[in-house]
Amino acid sequence: MKTLESLVAEKLLKIKAVKLQPANPFTWASGWKSPIYNDNRKTLSYPVVRSFIKLELARVISEKFENVDAIAGVATGAIAQGALVADLLGLPFVYIRSTPKDHGLENLIEGELKPGSKVVIIEDLVSTGGSSLKAVQAVRNFGCDVAGMVAIFTYGFPVAEAAFKDAKVTLTTLSNYDAVLEEAVRTHYIDESEIAVLQ
């Protein structure tokens, strides 16, 4: 029987939310060159995949965290999935901007969140952890308790693992880079000779 990590990896590869190009690396927004590109927003266009991810995120939250008061999504990639999960769990939803609005109330957190609330943050993708932990800090600065973060995918970079540990935040992901590589080889998306470039 397949693990959750493998099932999610299979779905992400199938809809091309994850692309692997060992011979022609992608350039990320950070300027890094990488043989993998992940765009989990694509999952929203596939009802079966979208629903599967929503159900699994909700299951993880229900199993790992007690007495959650609200769900927060990190803008922009986790807004839709976060709202779907909050709806399924019957919880309030807010989203966290990367920077405050430059007009109006200049909010960093959009929606109604009560100070003292226990919040689970949903993220679509964790790479270095920088933007994810910035969202955690915004919720903490608002006077709320961050129970943890749940994400669809992580690259598993050691720098991110260390950053989450330093910030005392539990990170749980549905899938990861290693699971994608295993699934990509199993389904012949890539061949064994390309693995060395990808590891």
Segments predicted by a language model, with ranges:
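Active-site-facing substrate-recognition patch
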Residues: 1-65
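PRPP-dependent phosphoribosyltransferase catalytic core
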Residues: 2-14, 137-199
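Conserved hydrophobic/aromatic pocket- or pore-lining residues that grip, position, or stack substrates
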Residues: 31, 71, 93
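Phosphate/pyrophosphate-binding loops at sites that engage ATP/ADP/AMP, CoA/4′-phosphopantetheine
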Residues: 57-69, 136-142
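Short glycine-rich phosphate-binding loop at a beta-alpha junction
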Residues: 66-75, 150
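Conserved acidic residues
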Residues: 69, 117, 147
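Short, glycine/charge-rich flexible loops or terminal/linker lids adjacent to PRPP-binding catalytic cores
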Residues: 76, 82-120, 128-134
